């Protein structure tokens, strides 16, 4: 069963660049320590940016996220899963609907809602159990929004905080869609088209403004 969560997929793909990134950042004596090291490399080394052209599958592909040095939650989750698999750690991508109470005016205007469907996270098989890790928001972005960056120790689930440092509502998990061997891109794109029609159709040349 775990072989499927070690294999490369179309979006949780494996390239020489991903293998090199994983080899460079997988530091530690055991799988848990290496997974933690990879988590921080993806969380902080790849900038979070939701202003992408989601009609292009490249927004969801791990190798493309690594090449650009930025991505949104699903793309960053794909990259962490890819790196973990390259290091021999079984990994799968999880998807959930969340309500983000602390978004930017520009993003809220484009999306038309604070509901984020198909938010991406990762589950890693460590010390005999699946553990959740959420590498989406890099430290610099969290500091800007006064949200504690998510830490990960490889033993406890790491999901978004319910409140920020000022005790304002931050992230509210509404529905979990389960976990996947690879990213169900067509399913996500179809839902994005239905819910975020203007945002979905935004082209990259019109999306140069950084999120944070």
Language-model features, listed with the residues they occupy:
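A cross-family glycoside hydrolase active-site/sugar-binding cleft signature
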Residues: 41, 94, 134
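Secondary-structure boundary elements
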Residues: 1-68
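Solvent-exposed, flexible loop/coil residues
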Residues: 15-16, 22, 52-58, 64, ...
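Active-site neighborhood of thiol-dependent amide/isopeptide-bond enzymes
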Residues: 51-118
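His-Asp-centered catalytic microenvironments across diverse enzyme cores
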Residues: 2, 6, 10, 98-212
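Short secondary-structure boundary segments
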Residues: 29-40, 71-89, 157-158, 204-210
